[in-house]
Design a protein with these regions (language model features):
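Small beta-barrel nucleic-acid-binding modules, principally OB-folds
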Residues: 44-53, 57-60, 152-159, 167
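Ligand-binding loop in jelly-roll beta-barrel domains
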Residues: 29, 81, 92-117, 199-222
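Glycine- and acidic-residue-biased ligand/ion/polar-headgroup-sensing regions
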Residues: 52-55, 62-77, 169-185, 191
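Acidic/His-leaning functional-site neighborhoods
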Residues: 139-193, 208
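A short, N-terminal "cap"/entry segment at the start of jelly-roll beta-barrel domains
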Residues: 1-41, 103, 107-152
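Short acidic-glycine-tyrosine-enriched beta hairpin
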Residues: 76-95, 184-203
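Short histidine-centered beta-strand/loop micro-motifs
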Residues: 58-62, 79-80, 98-99, 164-169, ...
Length: 222
């Protein structure tokens, strides 16, 4: 498979609800790839992945790290079980063997968390103590914000009717709509939509219904 949306200087908006599931090398594991740079199976890739009940993926290393957000169901490996809302950060040098009993859907970023000195984290974002309010109508759950690394990763929860101030994406911004609907001056984005905004772009988002977002910033700079 050739590279897909590899030019990170260009904006991308993809509604994954309109995509067909593609088979992976593992039986019962399906994917919708959103961006790909390099080798089809070992390159840098962002995707939505679905595991059928009782299926798994062979044990594998993470030479450049992996990020996994459980969207629904229960994801598992030899270290534990991770229900919907769990965010796992696996740095360079980590290894696991994924499986699921009842099926699950994941948002996965492979080869985008490189560095042996990065922390390994498994965070249950259902924990109310992890959320903090930044302004009226917006709460965030910080998942990664460490000195020495350009990117920040968080979940952002917007209450119905919330307007986000106009802002410039210094270092770029990536958003996946986990639930609800987000809008800005360019369009409307329902659950399952993935967006990548390049360094220096800007927008003024809002939500009428409320929404939950995965947000990664600062990783798309030159």
């Amino acid at each position: 498979m050739p590279s897909l949306h590899a030019d990170r200087s260009k904006p991308v908006v993809i509604d994954t609800n309109q995509m067909e599931w593609q088979a992976s090398p593992a039986p019962g594991v399906w994917r919708k790839r959103l961006e790909l740079v390099g080798d089809a199976e070992k390159g840098m890739v962002t995707s939505v992945v679905r595991f059928d009940p009782g299926c798994g993926f062979p044990a594998h290393d993470h030479p450049l790290g992996e990020e996994v957000l459980v969207l629904d169901g229960v994801f598992a490996d030899e270290f534990g079980e991770y229900p919907a809302g769990t965010m796992t950060l696996l740095p360079t040098g980590s290894r696991h063997e994924p499986v699921t009993a009842d099926g699950c859907t994941l948002f996965v970023k492979l080869c985008q968390y490189a560095g042996e000195d990065r922390p390994m984290r498994r965070t249950d974002t259902r924990n109310p103590d992890g959320w903090r309010q930044t302004y009226a109508g917006r709460e965030v759950f910080d998942l990664f914000d460490e000195p020495g690394w350009p990117e920040k990763i968080r979940l952002s929860r917007l209450a119905p009717g919330t307007e986000v101030p106009h802002h410039v994406h210094e270092g770029g911004e990536e958003v996946f709509v986990v639930s609800g609907e987000l809008a800005d001056e360019h369009g409307r984005y329902r659950a399952g939509t993935w967006m990548r905004f390049p360094d220096g772009s800007s927008h003024r988002p809002w939500t009428e219904s409320g929404c939950l977002l995965y947000v990664k910033t600062g990783h798309l700079g030159s």
